[in-house]
Amino acid sequence: MKRTVIAILLVFCLGVTQPALACTTILVGKAASADGSVMVSHSDDGLNDASMIYVPAQDHKPGAMRAVYYSHAALDFKPQWGATISHRIVTRERGPNYDIKDVPPSVPLGYIPQVAHTYAYFDANYGIMNEHQLSIGECTDKAKVHPEPEPGKRIFYSAELSRVALERTKTAREAIRLMGELIEKYGYYGTGETLLVADPHEGWVMEMAGYDMNGAGGVWVAQRVPDDQMFVAANQFRIRDIRANAEDMMYSANIFEIARAKGWWTPESGPLDFARVYGDGEFHHPYYSLRRVWRAQSLAAPSLGLSPWAEGPFTRAYPFAVTPDKKLTVGDIFAIHRDNYEGTEFDLTKGLAAGPFGDPNRFEGNAEGMADKEGKLTPAIGEFERPLNIYRCVYAHVNQSRSWLPDAIGGVVWFGPDRPATAVLMPFYAGATDLPIPIQKADILKFDRQSMWMAFNYVANYSMLKYSYMIKDIHAVRDRFETGAFERQPKLEAEALALWSKGDQAGARERLTRYSDQNARVILTDWWKLASNLYLKYNDGYLNTQKAIADPVFYPAWWLKQVGYEDGPTSYAPKGKRE
C-alpha cells in the first residue's frame, strides 16, 4: 500500500510540472498582414505569474552591473533563487511594479555589465514589446539536453535574454545578435526555446539550446520569415537545414563543431538539420506540437490542403512558413489561438469527453492506474488532443509593429488575460507611461477582485459547467468590447499622432496611456458583472431569466444514451427483468 501511495504521489508531482512546457507563437510578415504591420503572438500556457508589468526606461551609472535572474519557466520554480511560485521576479531594479512587498527577493544567478540607458518595455514571463516596437513571442521546445542553471557557467534562459534585448536594442537583427553573444559568453540553461523577434520592418525566428549538462555556452540559430508569410511554432524546434552564409540565417559559431563532437551530426550526412540534431521531437505525446502547427497553417492557408497526419516528429510536411490565403488581422491571429479544432475530426467540443454541454477543456495529467493482485499500478494508456486554446493559459497577446507611425503609437500589444477562447483583447501602446494596475496584479494564489486575470479566470472556470450555453453569453460581451476597440483605434491614434506632430510627445503618450487604462477598468467591472449574471442565469443547472425561473435545461439524447440513462429506475423490476 505504501508503494502504491508513493507511486501515485510521484505521478502527481511529475504531472503538475508539465504545464510549464507549453506555448504557441505566431509571426506574420508585413506583406502578409492586412495593414502592413509585422505581428507577433504568444500564448503563455503554463499556470504561473499571469501579470503584464511595465518596466520603465532607466539611466545607469558608469560601472553598474545588471542582475540576471532565474526563470521559473525554464525548469519550474526553484526556491533557492528567490521570489515565489506565483511571482516571476521580485526586485527594485526593474521599477516599482516588480518591487513587491512581503515576498522574498529574487536572487541573481550572475551579473553582466549594465549599459548607460535601458528602454521601457512590457514584460511578462517573457519580454513582450519595448518602446521602439521591438516585439517578442515565445514557445518552449524539447531539446536533447536541458542543463540546470549554474552561476559562472550557465546564467541565461530565453526569458532574461528577451528582457535584455528589449532593454538594449531597437531592431530584430540587433536583438538576435545580442542574445546570441550573451548565450555564448555567459552560458545557457533550461529547455530548448523558440523566440520570435520582430520590428516594424521584419520578423525572425531564433532557436536555442544547451548541449551539455555540465557545459558552458549554448547553441543558437535564427531564420528570417519572408515578408509575405506566416510562421507558427508550438513546442518543437521549427528551423531545419542550416545554410552557410545565407542572408536569411544567423547562427552561433560553434553550431557545427558541437554537433560533430557530440556525435549528433557529420558533414557527410548532409545539411545540419537543427530541429533533428539539437531537438528531441515533441513534448508529451505524438501530435502535441504538430497538430497545432497543422491547424494554424490550415486556418491561414486552407488552399494548401495540409494533412493532419504525419510520418513522425521530424516531418517536413508542414513548411517553415506559409503564405496566407488572405491578409491577416489581429483578430485573425487571435482566432487561431482561440481554436479547439472546431469543425475537424479532432473537435474538442464534440464527443463523450466534452460532456453534455460541449466543453472543449481536457485536463492533463497521468491517468489513474488500476492495481493488479500484487498492488502494482497499470496506467491507462491514451491521450487527448492538445488544442491551441488550452485551459491553463494565463495570458495571450498579439503585438503590432507599424513602420509608418512613431514608435510610441505604432507599437500595440493586444493583451488577453487567461485562456484565449474566453479572453478579451485590450490594446496597450508602446509609448505608454504605465499599465493599468489590474493588469499588473495577477497572483494566481490570491483571490483578488482587482485582478484582471482573476476576473477572466473565474468566468472561464465557471463556464465549464454549461459551456455550450455560457460561451454564447461570454462571446456576446467579448465581441462588444473587441469590436469597440478596433473601431476606436483609428480615431485614437489620429488624436495621438496630431499631438505628436505638434511636438507634444508627452501629451500623446498620456492620451494613449489614459485610454488603455480606462478601457481596461471598464472591462474589469463588466467582466465581474458577467460572472454574476452567469451565476444567476444558470444557477442550479436551470435557465433563469425575467421570463421564467428554473426553466429546465436537460441533457442531449445522445449523451443520455451513452451514460446509461435508459437503465435508470423506470420500473420496479430489476434491470434484467424489465419488459
Residue ranges of each PLM-predicted region?
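Substrate-recognition/cap regions that form aromatic- and gly/pro-loop-enriched pockets
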Residues: 362-500
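Glycine-rich, aromatic-lined ligand/substrate-binding cores of catalytic
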Residues: 254, 258-412
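A contiguous strand-loop segment
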Residues: 23-157, 178-328
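Histidine-centered catalytic/metal-binding microenvironments
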Residues: 478-579
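Second-shell loop/turn segments in exported
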Residues: 148-152, 160-169
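Positively charged n-region of N-terminal signal peptides that target proteins for export
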Residues: 1-4
